[in-house]
């Protein structure tokens, strides 16, 4: 509140806040995340709980995350409700795919839920494995071991075109590239496809 951030749109629910635990990796053993979201406020979100028109009244951009659709069918339905309202109100819509397979445990495949939702997005963010999970498009590949690694720009352009073909509304595709050398040594890059 001290910084002028409104809190009147906050919806309270669930039995508790969701938690996650990070077990840091060591050497060649990757980090591990344990999610504890069952019964949490976010996991109990349902359509009709949020007045999206009121929330979006002065907005021009709505950003959503695949995590919102991952916890339950009701959460995915609430996400659809938000997307339809944002679309109707003329907002720019962006999506971070954020596929966390450990969260998808309500019997629906990631692509079956995400593909209809992502159709509302003007901008999409994600890593290669997330695009593979949602769109079933083979990654271009990123095996950098240093900064001299040559990016396959034509391959990434084709990748972006494929996404834009599946999601005609999408004009920008951001792609995170990561090559894990050890648990604490990663090489990162990003590519933007703009239609």
Outline where the language-model segments fall.
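Conserved N-terminal subdomain of the carbohydrate kinase-like
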Residues: 1-67
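Hydrophobic beta-strand scaffold residues
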Residues: 7, 93-94, 125
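A generic structural signal for short hydrophobic patches within well-formed alpha-helices
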Residues: 41, 69, 100, 131-132
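Active-site glycine-rich loop that binds ribose-phosphate moieties when present
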Residues: 44-51, 77-81, 108-113, 154-158
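Catalytic-core regions built around general acid/base machinery
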Residues: 77-90, 112-120
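A short helix->loop->beta-strand "cap" motif at the edges of active sites that frequently abuts
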Residues: 85-92, 167-171
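Short beta-strand/loop segments at the ligand-binding rim of alpha/beta enzyme cores
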Residues: 89-98, 103
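Conserved phosphate/ATP/ADP-binding segment of small-molecule kinases
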Residues: 103-194
């Amino acid at each position: 509140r001290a910084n002028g951030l409104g809190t009147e749109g906050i919806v309270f629910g669930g039995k508790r806040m969701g938690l996650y635990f990070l077990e840091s990796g060591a050497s060649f053993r990757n980090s591990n995340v344990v999610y504890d979201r069952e019964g949490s406020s976010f996991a109990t979100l349902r359509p009709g709980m949020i007045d999206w028109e009121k929330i979006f009244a002065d907005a021009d951009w709505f950003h959503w995350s695949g995590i919102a659709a991952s916890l339950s069918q009701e959460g995915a339905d609430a996400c659809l409700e938000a997307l339809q309202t944002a679309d109707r109100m003329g907002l720019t819509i962006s999506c971070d795919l954020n596929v966390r397979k450990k969260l998808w445990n309500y019997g629906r495949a990631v692509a079956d839920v995400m593909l209809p939702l992502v159709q509302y997005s003007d901008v999409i963010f994600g890593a290669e494995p997330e695009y593979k999970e949602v769109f079933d498009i083979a990654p271009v590949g990123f095996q950098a071991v240093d900064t001299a690694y040559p990016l396959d720009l034509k391959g990434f352009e084709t990748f972006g075109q494929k996404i834009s073909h599946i999601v005609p509304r999408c004009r920008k595709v951001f792609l995170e590239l990561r090559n894990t050398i050890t648990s604490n040594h990663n090489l990162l890059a990003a590519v933007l496809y703009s239609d």
